[in-house]
Each structure stands twice: as structure tokens, then as C-alpha cells.
Curated annotation (Swiss-Prot):
This is Small ribosomal subunit protein bS21B. NCBIfam families: S21p. It comes from the Bacteria. GO terms for molecular function: structural constituent of ribosome. It comes from Gloeobacter violaceus (strain ATCC 29082 / PCC 7421). Residues 43-57 have a biased composition (Basic residues). One of its GO terms (cellular component) is ribonucleoprotein complex. Keywords: Ribonucleoprotein, Ribosomal protein. One of its GO terms (biological process) is translation. Belongs to the bacterial ribosomal protein bS21 family. Residues 37-57 are annotated as: Disordered.
Amino acid sequence: MTEVRLGENESIESALKRFKKKIQKAGILSEIKRRERYEKPSARRKRKAEAARKRRR
């Protein structure tokens, strides 16, 4: 669980910014987006192969 403690004299905006940064770094948002819909294993393999092909260019 990602947690951010509000420091003394720290604004909520800056704490929220730190929280968003931690969430992004942990990969939680991308994981949520990936799990929004079911993806068949064959479609997952196809997508990963396509991404690897694009990286090799």
C-alpha cells in the first residue's frame, strides 16, 4: 500500500503530487488499466510480441 504522510507546513497539493509520483513509479495505475477488461492469453501474447517487434526497430 502506498502511503504519503503530510509533513509540517506542507500543502495538500504537494503531498498529492508526491502520492501520484509514488503510484506512477510503483506501476499501480498501469496495472489497473491493464486489468479493466479481460484479455485472452493469445491476445496478450500477440500484444507482447508486437511490442517487442516495435522495440527492435
